[in-house]
């Protein structure tokens, strides 16, 4: 991964109270530090090797000029007056993932199959975790 974004949304907030962007050149890459207020928070994590990233907190999207491996997690945390410490968060792959469901019988001698995508997605809505910015197949 070359980039990590961490966005903190306190419960009910429409804009993040904190945005952290780390690159792999940063000494603390992969170990972001947040100071969270008491209450419930949605903390969104996005890690990617994508190029030409643009973050838009109004539309809750992160788009790329070229998408490569990308991982994501919507992490909910409840902070009390006595909460502190670190959390380990495991991100889920969300880009360059393919799930093929084949309902037809596969011939015994079949060794490969071809897939032709109808659209490429160049972004993620980090609140829903869904892809955005679809364009025609390349």
Regions found by a protein language model. Name each.
Residues 2-56, 109-138:
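Tryptophan-paired
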Residues 91-106:
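A short, Gly/Thr-enriched small/hydrophobic beta-strand-prone motif that recurs across taxa
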Residues 33-35, 76-78, 88-90, 101, ...:
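Generic structural detector for well-ordered beta-strands
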Residues 23-28, 50-88:
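Structured interaction patches on ligand/partner-binding surfaces of diverse proteins
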Residues 8, 85-87, 104-105, 117:
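Functionally constrained cores in energy, signaling, and assembly domains
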Residues 64-65, 108-110:
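Short, low-complexity, polar/charged sequence segments that are solvent-exposed and flexible
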């Amino acid at each position: 991964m070359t980039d990590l974004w961490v966005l903190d949304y306190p419960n009910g907030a429409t804009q993040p109270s904190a945005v952290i962007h780390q690159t792999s050149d940063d000494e603390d890459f992969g170990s972001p530090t947040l100071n969270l207020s008491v209450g419930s928070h949605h903390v969104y994590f996005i890690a990617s090797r994508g190029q030409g990233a643009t973050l838009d907190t109004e539309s809750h999207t992160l788009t790329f000029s070229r998408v490569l491996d990308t991982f994501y997690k919507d992490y909910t945390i409840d902070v009390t007056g006595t909460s502190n410490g670190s959390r380990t968060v495991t991100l889920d792959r969300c880009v360059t993932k393919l799930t093929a469901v084949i309902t037809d019988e596969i011939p015994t001698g079949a060794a490969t199959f071809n897939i032709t995508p109808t659209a490429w997605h160049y972004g993620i809505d980090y609140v829903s975790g869904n892809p955005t910015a679809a364009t025609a197949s390349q």
